[in-house]
Amino acid sequence: MAEYANIIVDIFNEKLDKTFQYRIPEAMKEKLTLGMQVYVPFGKRNIKGYVVELTDEPEFEVAKIKEIIGIVTDSVPIESQLIALAGWMKKNYGATMNHALKTVIPIKKKSNAVEHKSVRLKLTEIEAKSELAEFERKHQKARVRLLSALIENPQMDQSMITQKLNVSGTVIRALETMGIVEVVSERSYRNPVSHLDSKGYHLTLNEEQQSVVDAIERNLDQKIAKTYLIKGVTGSGKTEVYMELIAHMLAHGKQAIVLIPEIALTFQTVMRFYNRFGDRVSIMNSRLSPGERFDQFERAKNGDVDIMIGPRSALFTPFSKLGLIIIDEEHESSYKSETLPRYHARETAIERAGMCGASVVLGSATPSVESYYKAKTGEYELLELKHRVAEKPLPKVEVVDLREELKAGNRSILSVRLQELMEDRLKKGQQMMLFINRRGVAGFVSCRACGHVIKCPHCDVSLSQHVTRQHPEGKMVCHYCGYEIPMPKTCPACGSRYISGFKAGTQKIEMIVKERFPQARVLRMDMDTTRNKEGYEQILSAFANQEADILIGTQMIVKGHDFPNVTLVGVLAADLSLYVSDYHAAERTFQLLTQAAGRAGRGSEPGEVVIQTYQPDHYSVQAAKEQDYEAFYEQEMEYRRMLLYPPVWNMLVILCASKWEQTAYDSAKLLVQEIDTWQENIKAAMERVGEDFKKKRVFPVGPADPAVAKVNDIYKKVIYIKTKDYQTLVELKDRLEHYMRDNRAFKDTVVQFDFNPMSGF
């Protein structure tokens, strides 16, 4: 049993955002567990704190370590659960406890309360009329107006009194002092979905959907908690399945969290859930104000809502009766955090569910290779929806070879075939979507005379060309650090006038489409057009209401949206996601192409899809054309096995970053040496007891430059480590953290760990 507890005190002060050590009383040693709330002496007072670590190692002189006073008996259990989850994240993803706590309890600081004030009459009607007569005798007109109104309506909103009756706060306070009225204040929680209209919408499931629901509900009724993977083709009605499962949980007094991959999904998803469940639904996303975010956590904590919808941060909603976590589009890379701790929402959801006996449902038309592998090996239960609802056919997919287009003299980003189909849809009054995974006008700008590419001086990346109202001639922007300059008229290297952008982005596509189809109404949706809070909703609403014929956008337009009048989808450059130094490149390409194709033909008319590419024979393109997930999975797994990549193997990436390139390299080199030493020690210890070293063996590669070796004047070096056993990587991470703790060689280097990364550094 541990002798000491490291505790985070419950004070909203950045300077105190660290652990303090306390001695555990003998009578408390068997009761105290990780995540519990306790009372501790702090300065001259006693306050609450959270147990985040139990240890036998004193950090100070034993005589100076104070003792825990007691365990909080009436604490909200969910808070302790989230603290325990933070401890798990710290252990498994490599970050400080403070990083983990700020992730699982993102609202550590109370927002300014939104107060709703009303004025209430304290007197009987006879007493009030007597006071009114006195005010009239003294010609106190404001008091007469107020008291007359309150005799008619004994409680009124204070803002209405001040605005409509023209009664000042001074008059209200005077009557309050006289004991005639009282001012009542209530906390008013902001509800980001209060403007939606609940219709009690409910769809009858088809046989296939009902079969999936029944399979899960049988286990739920028997209190068997599992992780399920629903593999359902686009348009198969996964959302209706989710809602039926949630209704089942609500009927049993449980709560549910629904994760979405991007904020772009919130508008349509919330509308469908709100139509079914009304104000029991709330949303959590990064575009809410701090006050709105705080209010949603308070509403969840108080039990005012039962369903929270949002991106990965919604996973930490403080529900006390959590019964179900749904992760829609579970394959999305946005579920993996790119900041410390670099957690994956899927793994973390499964861990949280395990803490409270909840179930997890993963859903996708194109499951991640990792999830499908776990379903195939029995770790998850696989359930399938093989048909679209109402037996609607999957869209017809054509692949256009852009090399042949160029040979035929077509230099436009729009192939001849795509232009023909667009013309046809405009004549029929049908809608279409054009997808390209690139913002701006040009992916990079280069000189055709000398080949010079204009790069960011602070980052190892090319600048992108953008056109705005403020910069109609264009500007150059770095998408990593925000650096920007005006578009140069001549090459900075050789002075040539032949300088221009390559690889058209969304802005350029918009210009080309408007020029080619001047009669068309065009909308563009990317990060540049959706920067304000309502940007997504406005664009999606306009397109859903058929106020535009063509929607052009980046990957956010292909994420689960349902537009029945869309009968044509054009993927303009399928190769862009293949040109990435990342072992997920083919998987992402297949997923994007399949998801994009799934937007077509969801209404009464059949859909068509045109995929434009320079690599028509690539297996990800061919599998997407045939919409054959199994064929893609088998080919991809062969590649992963051959190159020792997840999910067959596990990978740890160690990033070393410094202001000085040599320092970053030297730090990485020291870590590689320590890895070798650790591995030799493990090997010797295992051989002494006759154990097989193979399962613990790791294969380090590096130090090496990542795909982007410098960002914002910070140099990066990486080490890649592969092994079959995930826990071995966790043990290695712990060893390296201990090695670096008091090592001055790392004082100018930031070291981060990323387990099974979703993208290259």
Region spans (language model):
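Short, intrinsically disordered low-complexity segments
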Residues: 37, 46, 690-727
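Intrinsically disordered or highly flexible coil/loop and linker segments, enriched in small
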Residues: 95-99, 110, 155-156, 431, ...
